């Protein structure tokens, strides 16, 4: 369960980074 939570956390971080890239690109 903890491993899954860790994965979700890193995934959220990755998505946030991608979102930032989109923001800066526009």
UniProtKB/Swiss-Prot annotation:
Chief localization: secreted
Alphabetical GO biological process terms: defense response to bacterium; killing of cells of another organism; monoatomic ion transport
Gene Ontology terms, MF aspect: toxin activity
Keyword Lyase found: no
Domain of life: Eukaryota
Localization, UniProt: Secreted; Target cell membrane
Tissue-specificity statement: Expressed by the venom gland.
Keywords for the protein's UniProt record, in alphabetical order: Antibiotic, Antimicrobial, Cytolysis, Hemolysis, Ion transport, Membrane, Neurotoxin, Secreted, Target cell membrane, Target membrane, Toxin, Transmembrane, Transport
Signal sequence residues: none
GO cellular component: extracellular region; membrane; other organism cell membrane
Coiled-coil portions: none
Disulfide bridge positions per record: none
Keyword presence, Secreted: yes
Family as reported in the entry's similarity comment: Belongs to the cationic peptide 04 (cupiennin) family. 05 subfamily.
Function text: Forms pore that permeabilize the cell membrane. Promotes efflux of calcium from synaptosomes, causes hemolysis, and dissipates voltage gradients across muscle membrane. Potently inhibits the growth of bacteria and yeast. May function both in the prey capture strategy as well as protection from infectious organisms arising from prey ingestion.
This protein's name: M-lycotoxin-Ls2a
Biological source species: Lycosa singoriensis
């Amino acid at each position: 369960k903890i491993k899954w939570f860790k994965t979700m956390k890193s995934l959220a971080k990755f998505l946030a980074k991608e979102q930032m890239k989109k923001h800066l690109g526009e």
